[in-house]
UniProtKB/Swiss-Prot annotation:
Annotated pathway: Carbohydrate biosynthesis; gluconeogenesis; Carbohydrate degradation; glycolysis; D-glyceraldehyde 3-phosphate from glycerone phosphate: step 1/1
Family statement drawn from the similarity comment of this UniProt entry: Belongs to the triosephosphate isomerase family.
Gene Ontology CC terms, in alphabetical order: cytosol
Species this chain originates from: Schistosoma mansoni (Blood fluke)
Protein name, entry field: Triosephosphate isomerase
Length: 253
């Protein structure tokens, strides 16, 4: 990771948690010390967002796991960026592979969500990544560019890019126990950074944080974190365990 980009670790709880379990995790996070060069975020299910934001120290961000592309209306089951901000949260995860593959969200819909979330003042973790069959067909770069291009078409200014973190999450490594090698992760992250150099406003390529998601654990995080273009992690299952605090410290000495 470049020293000019602040290390970023997000914990995506997915559809997990209870008030009792949450209290235990929040206690661990509240007692943990993260240095000034590390930014930490957790994304609980939406029903817990308000309660957790009120009880967790402000240094740790709280994110929603999803939102819709308009501010209000007859969209049963959806929440809007305005609602997320209204309860004190300032981040949202969009484009996660589970939203794409289980719920059928298209590149265009995800891009529209990103555009609206940014317009409403949220910061965004924008997820991209390929499936195993796409990797085996040597389509990793093609898929990532297709997904990223849809998002980039909706973001016009360098100022908006400052509120975006890109999460590269190879779908074949999510919840499978498989993990991209540090070299594989660096290769894709470096490719993405070069793509930004020619497809985004001047300077975005050096400043944007590109984080890795896919079976990150305390055992493999340090080696991954040493890669020049890996600026942090989006953590799934391990974010529900005490080891999450160790992952957050992957670059602390």
């Amino acid at each position: 990771m470049s020293g000019s980009r602040k290390f970023f670790v997000g914990g995506n709880w997915k559809m997990n948690g209870s008030r009792d379990d949450n209290d235990k995790l929040l206690k661990l996070l509240s007692e943990a010390h993260f240095d000034d060069n590390t930014e930490v975020l957790i994304a609980p299910p939406s029903v817990f967002l308000h309660e957790i934001r009120k009880s967790l120290k402000k240094e740790i961000h709280v994110a929603a796991q999803n939102c819709y592309k308009v501010s209000k209306g007859a969209f049963t089951g959806e929440i809007s960026p305005a609602m997320i901000r209204d309860i004190g949260c300032d981040w949202v995860i969009l484009g996660h592979s589970e939203r794409r593959n289980i719920f059928g969200e298209s590149d265009e819909l995800i891009a529209e969500k990103v555009q609206h979330a940014l317009a409403e003042g949220l910061s965004v973790i924008a997820c991209i990544g390929e499936t195993l069959s796409e990797r085996e067909s040597n389509k990793t770069e093609e898929v990532c560019v297709r997904q990223l291009k849809a998002i980039a078409n909706k973001i016009k200014s360098a100022d908006e890019w400052k509120r975006v973190v890109v999460a590269y999450e190879p779908v074949w490594a999510i919840g499978t126990g498989k993990v991209a090698t540090p070299q594989q992760a660096q290769e894709v992250h470096n490719f993405l950074r070069k793509w930004f150099k020619t497809n985004a406003p001047n300077g975005v390529d050096e400043k944007i944080r590109i984080i890795y998601g896919g079976s990150v654990t305390a055992a493999n995080c340090k080696e991954l974190a040493q890669q020049h273009d890996v600026d942090g992690f989006l953590v799934g299952g391990a974010s529900l365990k005490p080891e999450f605090t160790e992952i957050c410290k992957a670059r602390q000495r």
